[in-house]
């Protein structure tokens, strides 16, 4: 069993994990976000839904951040090589290419990582174990098996860019959404979690 899966198996919440910010610096412990509702997405700057999803992530962070939502984006190049820029190039790609027009994410972006396979970030190994399939499309699979560029392949793998994981204020994953489910449409589920108030976990 790889280290990522061992870490995922031992974890009880996302608070066991950390990730390095895209801008550099020390890793951010997700434990520092205790009591917040988290929306975690694997992102890519050259995907067909980049403009839609990035702008909707910004909108949710703008509207619901003051009430306790934290949006987290994890660039990943495992799906159609649609995040092939280096870490230091991603923000400029977003600003000038897609979405473009001076776009700047107002949410936390982390360094590129893998979300599937033996090299998967431990956070994503945990999320996939906790929520094996998207709630809106339990049969979601990668549409073209020739594009699978990781091993081992598991039934609970992330199928494409912009899958979403909603995590409650106790750090426990609540719901997973497919790439087809628009980010902005998660708002009612986020509102429901925010209305529960912060957890003491």
UniProtKB/Swiss-Prot annotation:
Oligomeric state and interaction partners are given as:
Homotetramer. Interacts with MIEN1.
Could you confirm whether the keyword Oxidoreductase appears in this record?
yes
- Residue numbers annotated as active site: 47
Starting at the broadest rank, the lineage of the source organism is:
Eukaryota, Metazoa, Chordata, Craniata, Vertebrata
Q: What is its EC number?
A: 1.11.1.9, 1.11.1.12
PTM annotation (N6-succinyllysine): residues: 86, 112, 146
Which organism is this entry from? Macaca fuscata fuscata
Could you name the Gene Ontology cellular component terms for this entry?
Answer: cytosol; mitochondrion
Matching PROSITE patterns: GLUTATHIONE_PEROXID_1 (PS00460), GLUTATHIONE_PEROXID_2 (PS00763), GLUTATHIONE_PEROXID_3 (PS51355)
Its principal location? cytoplasm
Q: Which family does it belong to?
A: Belongs to the glutathione peroxidase family.
The annotated site for Subject to oxidation and hydroselenide loss to dehydroalanine falls at 47
Which gene codes for it?
A: GPX1
Q: Give GO MF terms, alphabetically.
A: glutathione peroxidase activity; phospholipid-hydroperoxide glutathione peroxidase activity
Q: Catalyses which reaction? A: 2 glutathione + H2O2 = glutathione disulfide + 2 H2O; a hydroperoxy polyunsaturated fatty acid + 2 glutathione = a hydroxy polyunsaturated fatty acid + glutathione disulfide + H2O; tert-butyl hydroperoxide + 2 glutathione = tert-butanol + glutathione disulfide + H2O; cumene hydroperoxide + 2 glutathione = 2-phenylpropan-2-ol + glutathione disulfide + H2O
Q: Which SUPFAM superfamilies does its entry note? A: Thioredoxin-like
Keywords assigned by UniProt?
Acetylation, Cytoplasm, Lipid metabolism, Mitochondrion, Oxidoreductase, Peroxidase, Phosphoprotein, Selenocysteine
ATP-binding recorded as keyword? no
* Gene Ontology BP term (one): hydrogen peroxide catabolic process
Q: Where in the cell is it found?
A: Cytoplasm; Mitochondrion
Q: What does this protein do?
A: Catalyzes the reduction of hydroperoxides in a glutathione-dependent manner thus regulating cellular redox homeostasis. Can reduce small soluble hydroperoxides such as H2O2, cumene hydroperoxide and tert-butyl hydroperoxide, as well as several fatty acid-derived hydroperoxides. In platelets catalyzes the reduction of 12-hydroperoxyeicosatetraenoic acid, the primary product of the arachidonate 12-lipoxygenase pathway.
What name does the UniProt record give this protein? Glutathione peroxidase 1
Q: What modifications follow translation?
A: During periods of oxidative stress, Sec-47 may react with a superoxide radical, irreversibly lose hydroselenide and be converted to dehydroalanine.
């Amino acid at each position: 069993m790889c280290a990522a899966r061992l870490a995922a198996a031992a974890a009880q919440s996302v608070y066991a994990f950390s990730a390095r910010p895209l801008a550099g610096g020390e890793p951010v412990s997700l434990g520092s976000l205790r009591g917040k509702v988290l929306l975690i997405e694997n992102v890519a700057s050259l995907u067909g839904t980049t403009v839609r999803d990035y702008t909707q992530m910004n909108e949710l962070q703008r509207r619901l951040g003051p009430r306790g939502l934290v949006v987290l984006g994890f660039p990943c190049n495992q799906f159609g090589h649609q995040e092939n820029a280096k870490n230091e190039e991603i923000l400029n790609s977003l600003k000038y290419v897609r979405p473009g027009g001076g776009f700047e994410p107002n949410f936390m972006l982390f360094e590129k990582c893998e979300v599937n396979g033996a090299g998967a970030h431990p956070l994503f190994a945990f999320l996939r174990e906790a929520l094996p399939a998207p709630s809106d499309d339990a049969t979601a699979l990668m549409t073209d098996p020739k594009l699978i560029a990781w091993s081992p392949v598991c039934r609970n793998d992330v199928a494409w860019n912009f899958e979403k994981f909603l995590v409650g204020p106790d750090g426990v994953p609540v719901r997973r959404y497919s790439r087809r489910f628009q980010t902005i449409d998660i708002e009612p589920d986020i509102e429901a979690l925010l209305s529960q108030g912060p957890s003491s976990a």
